[in-house]
């Protein structure tokens, strides 16, 4: 993305933390533009962006390891504010003459910070002498400070939990202010960008819309564009952005891969053809997808297969249209960060996403990904900016691979139909209970397990259905939704009574981490 319209930029240097993008999310909540760059290219990015302030991320590495990542010396020579988070604090100290050691007591999870001194970093949130909850995740710790630094906060296992050189406006925090488990963390980051860096709020979804449209036009030129429309919020917003940018150069293609929710394909076609006048082609490729997935139980192979087939179908449809040069996808930040570090940094791969991990290396179209830098809640705000109705914007996320990854084990048409019906009943019960908007994501999973049951006077041996519901802000962390047991009982009874093939229902109470939201 071009940053010419945003002279007040914060540069976030990524050392490989899985939650680096949450730092960006918190900065954007403060209506300040920021970019994440890997430490390997931070020198170039620093020169290009000329940021007003810099934030150094956490990392799975140890500062004491030979060859561990370092921040460019140029940022410390520039006279601008710097905030180091966890590893970022440690490398800042090490680079400026302090000391960091391994082997001390580690801190993982909730901890309590004692504020030792007042500071602009704490303004309006924490006062000297008070104690506050934070979230720690570190094995190393600072043991001596560089010249000019003082301790302004401590915790039981981190005597240098918050440090500051107020004159040079360098700050370090051993905890993670970017995660929701540090209740005041977002305000602390706002203090850094507004009070300390002095950047004024000016970056909004309206501004992003203009920037994205400009970027699409610049990338596409006069080329033909097709959009991978699924009917979800992400692809729909991407389609509307692309249509605003290039108009009739765009054709949307909806692939019915046989893995969508009940009646979803028809609902999407009606909405986009009738309400938004977008050129839309519906392709029934269900036989092709389900045939390729038949008997496949490995979740990574499922995702890769689905991604490969998507591209094959789009290329075929593009040829029917006389050729297309670009493919629009609704890829988001979390999609990419969980596949491989978006920034090229050393973060650990959790699982591939069909949008990024399944693409053939020799794809014949160039990708256009206007939402690649956004989180889910930002996409919803952008959708509202583009005029999408609240009822549509508030739909729960649905994965591109669809029901295939909610059907662990081998995929068959029969199992997909059973799952589709169970999922529809579950969501219907949620809506009738008025809970839909309180839940980030809810869905049914058909387990590759059969159990004995009794219905009437007969013995049954049928599948187990797992119900999943989570609360989340951005999809990076999540907690299971705490239903009333009567609700679960009613939902289970309906599913067992109305769906042939299921005789047992269970509820998933796993948070993220350690689990992921989806089962595969």
Curated annotation (Swiss-Prot):
Molecular function per GO: ATP binding; GMP synthase activity
CDD domains the UniProt entry points to: GATase1_GMP_Synthase (cd01742), GMP_synthase_C (cd01997)
Cleaved signal peptide residues: none
Name of the top EC class for this enzyme: ligase
EC number: 6.3.5.2
Keywords: ATP-binding, Glutamine amidotransferase, GMP biosynthesis, Ligase, Nucleotide-binding, Purine biosynthesis
InterPro entries referenced in this protein's UniProt entry, alphabetically: Class_I_gatase-like, GATASE, GMP_synth_C, GMP_synth_GATase, GMP_synthase, GMPS_ATP_PPase_dom, NAD/GMP_synthase, Rossmann-like_a/b/a_fold
Pathway: Purine metabolism; GMP biosynthesis; GMP from XMP (L-Gln route): step 1/1
Catalytic activity: XMP + L-glutamine + ATP + H2O = GMP + L-glutamate + AMP + diphosphate + 2 H(+)
A cellular component annotation (GO) from this entry: cytosol
Active site positions, chain numbering: 86, 176, 178
Glutamine amidotransferase type-1 domain ranges (all copies): 9-202
Annotated NCBIfam families: guaA_Cterm (TIGR00884), guaA_Nterm (TIGR00888), PRK00074.1 (NF000848)
Function: Catalyzes the synthesis of GMP from XMP.
Assembly, per entry: Homodimer.
Protein name per Swiss-Prot or TrEMBL: GMP synthase [glutamine-hydrolyzing]
Native source organism of the sequence: Brucella abortus (strain S19)
Gene giving rise to this polypeptide: guaA
